[in-house]
Amino acid sequence: MRSLTVASRHPGAAFSTRRRPLLHPAAAGRDSTFQRCWRWEKTQDSSFGSSLRTSRLPRTVHGDILKNLLAPTAGAVSVEQAEAIADLPKGDMWSVHKFGGTCMGTSERIHNVADIVLRDPSERKLVVVSAMSKVTDMMYNLVNKAQSRDDSYIAVLDEVFDKHMTTAKDLLAGEDLARFLSQLHADISNLKAMLRAIYIAGHATESFSDFVVGHGELWSAQMLSYAIQKSGTPCSWMDTREVLVVNPSGANQVDPDYLESEKRLEKWFSRCPAETIIATGFIASTPENIPTTLKRDGSDFSAAIIGSLVKARQVTIWTDVDGVFSADPRKVSEAVILSTLSYQEAWEMSYFGANVLHPRTIIPVMKYNIPIVIRNIFNTSAPGTMICQQPANENGDLEACVKAFATIDKLALVNVEGTGMAGVPGTANAIFGAVKDVGANVIMISQASSEHSVCFAVPEKEVALVSAALHARFREALAAGRLSKVEVIHNCSILATVGLRMASTPGVSATLFDALAKANINVRAIAQGCSEYNITIVLKQEDCVRALRAAHSRFFLSKTTLAVGIIGPGLIGRTLLNQLKDQAAVLKENMNIDLRVMGIAGSRTMLLSDIGVDLTQWKEKLQTEAEPANLDKFVHHLSENHFFPNRVLVDCTADTSVASHYYDWLKKGIHVITPNKKANSGPLDRYLKLRTLQRASYTHYFYEATVGAGLPIISTLRGLLETGDKILRIEGIFSGTLSYIFNNFEGARTFSDVVAEAKKAGYTEPDPRDDLSGTDVARKVIILARESGLGLELSDIPVRSLVPEALKSCTSADEYMQKLPSFDEDWARERKNAEAAGEVLRYVGVVDVVSKKGQVELRAYKRDHPFAQLSGSDNIIAFTTSRYKDQPLIVRGPGAGAEVTAGGVFCDILRLSSYLGAPS
C-alpha cells in the first residue's frame, strides 16, 4: 500500500488550551494527494496528462504550477511510519454529529454548530461536516465548465473563494484567520492550475473531479475547527481521505472497506488523540489512495461509517427539520414528526423516496445497534426522530403499527401475461434477465399466484427500453400465443405504507384499502412481502396525492376528525361558527374530536380552505379572501378533500333550493346536519326518498334543530319509537315567537303592542307575518307526523293564520305593522272570552297519530295546564304514548333564538362524532 504522506506540521496533535497552530496535511498531504491522483491519471488518461504537461502556458508559469502542485513538503512522513502515541478508544464515550451544508451555510451558522458541539457533554465527540451550502454544486459546476471550455469557470472559482473568505473574516480573527486564508489562497491556486489543465484537455476524469469537489468539505472542516479552538477546547480536524477507504461497486455507488478504514483511523488517532475531532464528510479514498467521494448523501454515510468504526453511543444528523415526518409535509400538511423509527422502517421509507436518509446510511450502524437521531439545528429544543433497532411500542393500537407513508412518482407498470407462463421454469428469470440487460431498475414486483401474469414497476424514463427488450425476448412466445401480451401502463405512482408491527396486527390492509375506496382510488397493483414491513400499491399518478392524504388521515388523524362545510353564515351560522371557535380546542383535548371548517358559503361569496379556516378570523377572511359563491364548487371542495376521513355539510339557511341537494350530498358520502325545515316538510315523495337513502347507507342526516331549536324533541320521539312505545298524540307550542306573544298578551296590553315588542326584541322574522301565518308551526307538525309514521303533506294540515285577511296583501312589514292596531279590538275580545272561562290563549300544533291527522290552531287552556305556565319564548311539547298515557312526557325549554338553535346544530355535530367513534 502506498503511504499517505503528511506534513510534519500536521495538526495531528490535538490543540492544547494554549492554542497551538491549526495545521493539517492540506498543507502538504493535500499536495501529495494530488501527486497520487496525478500519477493515477497519467496511467488512465494520457491525453489529460499530456495536456497538463504541454499546455501553452508561459514556461515560468507552467513550472510554478507544477512545482506548487507536485513538490512534496519537506519533512513529510508516512502514516505507517508515525509512532503510535495513543490507542483509539471505542464505545459509548463517543458521540458522532453530522452537520450538512445548510447547517454550515454562514458564519453565524458555523458559530451555532460550534456551540452545539461544545454543549455536548459526551466524553469524546467526532463531528462530520459537509461543504458550505451550495458549494458542492459550485465545485461540480467548475469542473463542468472547465471541461466544456467555458471561461466562466474562473468567475465561479472566484465566487467560491469570496464565499469562504467572507465567512472566515466574519468567523475568525488574528492568526487563525491568517492561517486559514493562507491555506485557502494556496488551494485556490492549485485548483486554478488543475482547472486550466482540464480546460485545455476538454475532459476531466472522475477522480480529478472528485479531488476538486472535495475541497468544500476541507474548508468547512477547517473553519469549524478554528471556531471550536477559540473556546480553548482541544480539537483536531481530519481529512477523511486519509482514513475512509471505499471500493467502487457500480454507478454512483461505493462499498466501505471497514477493516482498512479502521486500521487507518487507529493510525490517524495515534497521532491526533483529541477528544474533539472535526472530520470531512463526503470524501474518501480508494485502496490505491486515489481521492473519491461517497456519492449521494455522502456526508450522512461518512458519519454512519465513522460512528460504526468508533462504536459510538449515537449518531446525530443535524438538518433543517424537526425530524422524520409521517408523510411528505408538502403533500400532507397534517404530517406529524415521528418520535422513533426502526432501522427497517427508515430503510423502507428511504427506498420509497422519503426524505429520511439514504438506505446505505443505515447499514453501518445496524451492526452495532447505534441509534441515528435526526434533529433540527434551528430548533434545538425539539427532540427529533430516533432511528434504532426496535422502538418501544407506546400503545399497540392499529394506528401505531403504521409509522409512515412514502410515494414514488413517474413510474410505469409493465404487465407480462399469458397462459403459457404457468408452471414453466425460468420465465421470471427470462423476464428480469431482459430487464437487467437494458440496465433498468425494477422498483416493485407482483405476481399472480396462478403464475398467469407478472407485473413490475420501473421508472417511466426506462420503460421504452424495457418494453422493447421484452418484446424482442418473447417474440416467439407472443407469436405462438403462449404469452398474450406485454403491456405498459404509463403515468403511475407507488404509495408505500410502512410499519414494523403491521405483520402482527390484523386489519391494517383492510383499513388502508377502505380509506382508498372511500377516496374513490383505483388500485392497479399490490405487493407485500411476508415480513410485512410495507404494503406497496401502484395507482394512477394523478391520484397519488389524494391517495396519500386519504391513507394518512385514516391512520394519523382522529377517527372523529370532521371536515365541516357551513352554508349560510347568517344569524344561526355566525353563532355556530363562534361556538365552534370557543369549543374546538376543548373537544380535541378531552374527546379527540377534531372539527375543521373547510369552507363557509354565503349567498354571494364563499371562503374555501384546504386545511381548515382560522375561526378567530373567519369574518375578516370572508371579506378579504372570498370568491364568488358557487354551491357546486363548494360541495366539490369538501367532497374531494380526502385528507380528512369524514365530511359534513351544515345547512344553516332556510332555503328550499339548498335543501333540495341533500339527497345528492348523502349519496356522495357527505353527512348532512341542518335546522332547515324545508326538506323534511317538503313533498312527501322526496322526503321518503331521502330517508330511504339515509337508512340504506352509513351516511348520517341529523335535523334535531328543525323542531324546538336546541330542545331534544326529535331524539326523544325517536327514543320512544325505537324502544317500542306507541305514539298516540303530540301537542305543543312549537314557535318561540308565538309563545312570547301569547305569554305577554295579557292585562291591558294590545296585541299590536306585543307584536311590535317581539319584533323589536328580535323574536320575529323581519316580516312578523312569516311567524303569524302559522306556516312554520305547520312545518314542524309535518316533521313530527312523518317521524311518527304518518304520510302527511303540508297541504293536509289545517292552519289558523293569525294574519287578518285584510292585511295579507300589505306590500311591506312596515305597512302591516301600521295597520295591525286596527284589529286590536278583535284580539281583545278573544282574550276576554278565554279569561272569562279561566283560560289563556296559546298557539299550538297537534299531531293526532290515532286519527292520522294534524292541525295548527289557537286554543284556550286552563291556567293550571302546563301550556299556561310558560314564560318568555319557551317551547313545550307533550308526548302522549302507550307508556305516558295518563301523564304525558313533557319537554320544555327555550325554543327560539340564535344561541339555542346553533347549540342544537352543534349537538348534532357532536352526535355525529359519537356515531363515528368519539368517546361518550
Curated annotation (Swiss-Prot):
NAD(+) binds at residues 572, 601, 653, 897. Keywords: Amino-acid biosynthesis, ATP-binding, Chloroplast, Kinase, Lysine biosynthesis, Metal-binding, Methionine biosynthesis, Multifunctional enzyme, NAD, NADP, Nucleotide-binding, Oxidoreductase, Plastid, Repeat, Sodium, Threonine biosynthesis, Transferase, Transit peptide. One of its GO terms (cellular component) is chloroplast. L-homoserine binds at residues 765, 776. Residues 93-341 are annotated as: Aspartokinase. Its cofactor is a metal cation. It catalyses: L-homoserine + NADP(+) = L-aspartate 4-semialdehyde + NADPH + H(+); L-homoserine + NAD(+) = L-aspartate 4-semialdehyde + NADH + H(+); L-aspartate + ATP = 4-phospho-L-aspartate + ADP. NADP(+) binds at residues 572, 604, 653, 677, 762, 765, 897. One of its GO terms (molecular function) is homoserine dehydrogenase activity. It comes from the Eukaryota. Pfam families: AA_kinase, ACT_9, Homoserine_dh, NAD_binding_3. Pathway: Amino-acid biosynthesis; L-lysine biosynthesis via DAP pathway; (S)-tetrahydrodipicolinate from L-aspartate: step 1/4; Amino-acid biosynthesis; L-methionine biosynthesis via de novo pathway; L-homoserine from L-aspartate: step 1/3; Amino-acid biosynthesis; L-methionine biosynthesis via de novo pathway; L-homoserine from L-aspartate: step 3/3; Amino-acid biosynthesis; L-threonine biosynthesis; L-threonine from L-aspartate: step 1/5. Its EC number is 2.7.2.4, 1.1.1.3. Na(+) binds at residues 704, 707, 709, 711. Residues 416-491, 497-574 form the ACT domain. GO terms for biological process: aspartate family amino acid biosynthetic process; homoserine biosynthetic process; lysine biosynthetic process via diaminopimelate; methionine biosynthetic process; threonine biosynthetic process. InterPro entries: AceGlu_kinase-like_sf (IPR036393), ACT-like_dom_sf (IPR045865), ACT_Aspartokinase (IPR054352), ACT_dom (IPR002912), AK-HSDH_N (IPR041743), Asp/Glu/Uridylate_kinase (IPR001048), Asp/hSer_DH_NAD-bd (IPR005106), Asp_kinase (IPR001341). Residues 567-920 are annotated as: Homoserine dehydrogenase. The active site is at 780 (proton donor). Residues 1-92 form a transit peptide. NADPH binds at residues 572, 653, 677, 897. Residues 1-21 are annotated as: Disordered. Bifunctional aspartate kinase and homoserine dehydrogenase that catalyzes the first and the third steps toward the synthesis of lysine, methionine and threonine from aspartate. Homo- or heterodimer. In the N-terminal section; belongs to the aspartokinase family. This is Bifunctional aspartokinase/homoserine dehydrogenase 1, chloroplastic.
